[in-house]
Amino acid sequence: MHSQQSRRSQIGNRGLLVLFLAIFVVMMGFGIVLPVLQFYARSVGATPLEIGLLATSYAFMQFLFAPLWGGLSDRIGRKPVFSIGLIGYAVSFVIFGLSHQVWQLFLARILGGVLSAATLPTAMAYIGDTTSEDRRGGGMGMMGAAMGLGFTIGPGIGGLLGRHNLSLPFFVGAALALVTLILSWGALPEPVRHPSSAERPSRIDAFRLALGGPLAYYFVVTLVAAFALAALEATYALFAQDRLHLSSTSGAGAIGVVFVIVGLVQAAILGGLVGRLINRWGEERLVRAGLVLAAIGYLLVTGTHNIATLAIYAAVAGAGHALMRPSVASLISKRTPGGQGLSIGIMDSFDSLGRILGPAWGGWVYHAGITLPYVSAAAALALTVGVSFSAAARGVPAHAGSE
């Protein structure tokens, strides 16, 4: 028993380092395409609604297939499934970069959503296999840091590459995915798997339990916040191009800078500030503050007329989300007497649902007015805050019954 634990620890130390590098590289590759994706899709002839549906189709495929890949990794191993996800990133990026028709863009995004859904769930399962309970939080934190670092650096690189050629970031992203594949296959040890024997409820049952439980308000907050953010992300490049009169190449560079600034602000908040604020003010106040700050940021974006103010206002909205999401996760974890993993998993499902609905909504209302995605997102966040204060005024806390 002791030798097995020792081997598990050795694999864990080495595996976490390799996994950190792998997630960082693949997320940097994913981040590289973000500043140019909407510009490229518009150059092919996609409408704002179709651009929104591209994001929706990708998120929907990930929502459907992530649990399936996770189950498959329990049976055949973490490395093979993780590798399938990396191949999916590479192939889908290449197809997207070579596309000249809208249906080809959808093919690339749907295929990418199906296959890339194998990556992050398998990485999380790998951490569970190779860390003890007291080290698991640190392992998950490392993965979050790798993702955040990749997302911060990637868009800046993508914006620079996009200034020369809108297809180039997709090919660089594909190359980085293949580099990650080689790195992980050669250096990532296959762990001893510890699949759970507990029967898990279906997603439909999980949603029903969540909406009927004492934490329903915070699951709805997660859904609305993800919806609002996804509606913004699905149209931000179109808005910058139409409002600021940017070309596709100059717009890609400008949006890359915006992403980097927002990423740095969020990293500063998530890197330690949010924990101190939670200890001082509590999760509930921070959730409300984050929702209000994000709503203000969205409304400010509608009045921007240069890239500097767009970056500042987007950073305000990003700061609101950075305050809110960890506060919701902390509150749900603390107020769940058992099965925290299931509760956080349900929270992630609500987040995924918001990311499915938000882009389609953003692309649809963009036709009616380029500021409507942001105004409607701010209204949804404000309504969520209003529900919280209304419940408190009636003496019914949003978490009633949870203690």
Describe each PLM feature range.
Residues H2-N13, P189-V220, E403:
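Juxtamembrane intracellular "pre-TM" segments in multi-pass secondary transporters
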Residues P35-P48, T235-G253:
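Short amphipathic helix-loop junctions that connect adjacent transmembrane helices
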Residues G45, G77, L98-Q104, L115, ...:
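Helix-breaking motifs and short loop linkers at transmembrane-helix boundaries and internal kinks
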Residues F63-H100:
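Conserved MFS/SLC helix-loop-helix module at the cytosolic interface between two early adjacent transmembrane helices
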Residues A66-I76, I269-E283, Y366:
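Helix-to-loop junctions at the C-terminal end of transmembrane segments
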Residues A108-G148:
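Cytoplasmic helix-loop-helix junction between adjacent transmembrane helices
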Residues M143-W185:
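Helix-loop-helix hairpin linking two adjacent transmembrane segments in secondary transporters
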Residues E284-V328:
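C-terminal transmembrane helical hairpin of 12-TM major facilitator-type secondary transporters
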